[in-house]
Amino acid sequence: IKFKKTGIITHSSGNFAHALAKAAYDLKIPCYIVMPSDTDNFKKHSVYAYTKNIFMCDSNLLSRETTTKTIAKKNNLYFIHPSNNLDVILGNSTCALELLNDYSDLQYIFSPIGGGGLIAGTSLAAKNFFKSCNIIGVEPQNVDDAYRSVKSGKIETNLTTNTIADGLRTNLGSINFPIIQEFVEEILLVTENEILSSLKLIIEKLKIVVEPSSAVVLAALIKNKKRFRNKKIGLIMCGGNVDIQSLKF
């Protein structure tokens, strides 16, 4: 691996940071992580278990990118984008592929949208191997950049990061956006209250722990239950990086 000696770096609010740090730890590759300063302690500690090279930045995309570039240049690190990277997108596609291999008759898959890597991979898997399955994206109403991007035909940015779904605060990228444009059928929006209500329902009824960024898909399904009644639907809820005690239902 070309960067095994020098190391790698990414910016992430938690999930990709955790995954990359764990992989780098197993492969004995130096790993540096840039995280927003408002990242909760639970996520910080999860990453800290695998790397001590954690740097804080302001909670906006510009700060994440500039901080990452500065550290990468200083330490000669290889940058791996958390969502706008083809290898990452293809890696994400295996989630939907496994789901569709088990349930090949699904008519829809709902996927969260943050930086766009997960839903881009999800849509590639579905449309290449299970063409009859439609992909629905979901994002918080407060950070609806993907929804606006598809409407305008160009990558839009968020004016705020004010959502409990902290993993969905980032913007789309030049690699995943064309994939989303071509293969994602529709993007649905949900409110903060709808996200919290769905999160509570998942924890209480399904007895599984997910983070708010994952709960958006159930929130969208409940909000549009009449439209999707009697349809076979898969929900991708792949993030469980959350401190339950920090949530206010």
Question: Predicted segments — roles?
Answer:
Residues 1-249:
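PLP-dependent amino-acid enzyme catalytic core
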